[in-house]
Design a protein with these regions (language model features):
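Core dinuclear metal-dependent hydrolase active-site scaffold
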Residues: 1-57, 78, 141-144
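Active-site metal-binding motif and surrounding structural segment of the metallo-beta-lactamase
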Residues: 59-66
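A sequence-composition feature that detects small, non-aromatic residues
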Residues: 3, 7-8, 13-18, 32, ...
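Active-site/binding-pocket entry motifs
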Residues: 1, 69-70
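Active-site metal-binding loops of divalent metal-dependent hydrolases
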Residues: 47-48, 67-69, 103-104
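Binuclear metal-ion centers of metallo-dependent hydrolases, dominated by the metallo-beta-lactamase
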Residues: 56-58, 73-75, 83-144
Length: 144
């Protein structure tokens, strides 16, 4: 992904150079976007996996986290339940609110993922982040 940084005619942004050392050049990468608006920030993580070196230090107001598939952390399969994985990711990111994506049977032949245990873990008193559900084609207020 970042193999051409050294050959770039202009000096790359420092953040891009820093990310070069924090991820694998061989696993296809993680699809994630941090959207920053005047009302707040939102991390959209489209894969059930992340690299600590990239996510560490991000503090999104809202996190949209994938719970589908086999999660991995730092390129290695996560050892534990999907609830354990989600709680570890939420502890690292410390978002104010969390919703889940890529858990439904969107494509025929692929089963959905039961998100109720993960949602319940965020709905207990004292949870580090609040859970909110999203429905198809239904607007959701993201920021309070």
């Amino acid at each position: 992904l970042f193999a051409g940084l050294d050959a770039a005619p202009d000096r790359p942004a420092p953040a891009l150079v820093a990310m070069n050392e924090k991820c694998s050049h061989h696993d296809g990468g993680q699809l994630a976007y941090l959207l920053i608006t005047s009302r707040g920030s939102m991390l959209i993580s489209g894969s059930a996996g992340y690299w600590r070196g990239i996510f560490d230090g991000l503090r999104p107001d809202v996190a949209l986290l994938s719970l589908g598939g086999r999660p991995n952390v730092d390129g290695e399969p996560f050892q534990g339940s999907s609830v354990d994985y989600m709680l570890e990711q939420v502890t690292l990111l410390r978002p104010g609110r969390v919703a889940f994506c890529h858990h439904d049977p969107l494509f025929p032949g692929l089963p959905g993922v039961d998100i109720e245990p993960a949602a319940a873990a965020l709905q207990v008193p004292g949870a580090s982040a609040g859970y909110f559900a999203m429905e198809y084609a239904t607007p959701v207020p993201l920021f309070g």
